[in-house]
């Protein structure tokens, strides 16, 4: 077989392989093809890109086919276009699902808060004179949004260097003498990585634009550090915010805590263990209460292995995070599980999870919410989003923008309930 013929055959085989990969990527977005082992990491990443950005995915698929179609034989070209057509239908439906995610979020809020709930936050807190709504969503904008809002960065709240730094997001014209509500953001990263910059930008930029102060923290990671160092740092940062946020125009009496993945776990645990001395060594008297919790795709039960834990999670916890076998020290795993600490005094919760989550099974959220609703006296809102993967809110997709608005509405209801009878001050622009 001559070189030209060999190149021709390779080109045809390559086109069929690309068509198969295209089809698999679209199918994976609807139903993850792997939930175990390292393959699940690829399933998650590809699913995240396809479900949150289906139209750019479609454009790249069709563009590649257009560029190569003339060099394909008629049968191969026909198969490639047929597969592309079915993939296009699937991707267009995913785009529609993302743009209409507000329907599921609205239904969740109506169910958890009642149909008479607030649907806007106007008039609840003092807003900057130029404050509006969140900017147009998009992944490119989210890459630079930090520069628009983070005006106080790398503030130390503890003794462990960069691991104990936090950033404060606010509009530059926010009244520093005011009492803006505060969002406290904890990054995810399997307790081993993650940074205060790069996560929850759609939510923080949306709330900062509306007059909130958002605090994003770092905390100590494993394997260099061992549980419960992570939650101790979260509590220490909370204590710092309570003591100092008024210097930046924030209200220490209204703090909503949030985070995704490991941050979802830590935010829930912090919300359910206010002033717990086990997690506040050396600062037991500090106030670490929060007024609301909004965890995203978190791990809520370290002991539920059969149907609600990724197979790689327990080895991670035993070898790198807790560093003890679960069977030898079950109490540590129970203490680290937010579900263990649910009580009637739990703050209002808004739990969000993707139904297609390949890394943290949705059963974690379902079980946690069921327990919360049975015990807590406060509202519990649960949004389970179809065709949605882990870390869906990382960049500025349509679904992430809808989610930011839904969180605003939830927090507006909580804020209004806790501030009934009070009036916000006038909007003030700072020159």
Swiss-Prot record:
Pfam families: BD-FAE. Its EC number is 3.1.1.-. It is found in: Membrane. GO terms for molecular function: hydrolase activity. Keywords: Hydrolase, Membrane, Transmembrane, Transmembrane helix. Gene3D superfamilies: alpha/beta hydrolase. It comes from the Bacteria. Its main location: membrane. The chain crosses the membrane at residues 7-27, 38-58, 75-95. It is an enzyme of class 3 (hydrolase). GO terms for biological process: symbiont-mediated perturbation of host innate immune response. The active site is at 261, 357, 390. It is a multi-pass membrane protein. GO terms for cellular component: extracellular region; plasma membrane. The keyword Membrane applies. Belongs to the 'GDXG' lipolytic enzyme family. This is Probable carboxylic ester hydrolase LipM. It comes from Mycobacterium tuberculosis (strain ATCC 25618 / H37Rv).
């Amino acid at each position: 077989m001559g070189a030209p013929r060999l190149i021709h055959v390779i080109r045809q085989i390559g086109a069929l392989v690309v068509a198969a990969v295209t089809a698999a990527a679209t199918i994976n977005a609807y139903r993850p093809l792997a939930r175990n082992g390292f393959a699940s990491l690829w399933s998650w990443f590809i699913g995240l890109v396809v479900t949150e950005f289906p139209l750019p995915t479609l454009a790249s698929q069709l563009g590649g086919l257009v560029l190569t179609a003339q060099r394909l034989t008629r049968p191969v070209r026909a198969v490639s276009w047929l597969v592309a057509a079915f993939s296009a239908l699937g991707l267009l439906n995913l785009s529609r699902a993302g743009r209409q995610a507000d329907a599921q979020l609205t239904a969740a809020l109506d169910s958890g808060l009642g149909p008479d709930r607030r649907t806007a936050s106007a008039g609840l807190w003092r807003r900057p004179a130029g404050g509006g709504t969140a900017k147009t969503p998009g992944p490119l904008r989210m890459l630079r949004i930090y520069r628009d809002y983070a005006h106080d960065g790398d503030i130390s709240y503890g003794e462990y260097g960069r691991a104990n730094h936090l950033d404060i997001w606010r509009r530059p014209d926010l009244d520093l003498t005011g009492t803006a509500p505060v969002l406290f953001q904890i990054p995810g990263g399997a307790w081993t990585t993650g940074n205060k910059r790069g996560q929850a930008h759609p939510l923080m930029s949306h709330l900062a634009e509306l007059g909130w102060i958002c605090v994003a923290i770092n905390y100590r990671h494993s394997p260099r550090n061992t549980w419960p160092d992570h939650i101790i740092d979260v509590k220490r940062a909370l204590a710092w915010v309570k003591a100092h946020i008024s210097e930046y125009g924030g209200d220490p009496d209204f703090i909503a805590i949030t985070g995704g993945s490991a941050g979802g776990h830590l935010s829930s645990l912090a919300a359910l263990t206010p002033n717990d001395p086990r997690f506040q060594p050396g600062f037991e008297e500090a106030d670490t209460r929060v007024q609301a919790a909004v965890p995203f795709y978190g791990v809520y039960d370290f002991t539920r292995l059969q149907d609600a834990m990724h197979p790689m999670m327990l080895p991670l916890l035993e070898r790198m995070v807790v560093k003890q076998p679960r069977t030898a020290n079950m109490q540590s795993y129970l203490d680290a599980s937010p579900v263990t600490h649910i009580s009637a005094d739990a703050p209002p919760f808004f739990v969000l999870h993707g139904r297609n989550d390949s890394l943290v099974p949705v059963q974690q959220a379902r079980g946690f919410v069921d327990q919360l609703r049975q015990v807590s006296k406060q509202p519990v809102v649960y949004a389970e989003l179809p065709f949605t993967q882990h870390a869906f809110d990382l960049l500025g997709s349509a679904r992430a923008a809808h989610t930011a608005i839904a969180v605003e509405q939830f927090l507006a209801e909580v804020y209004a309930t806790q501030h009934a009878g009070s009036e916000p001050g006038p909007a003030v622009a700072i020159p």
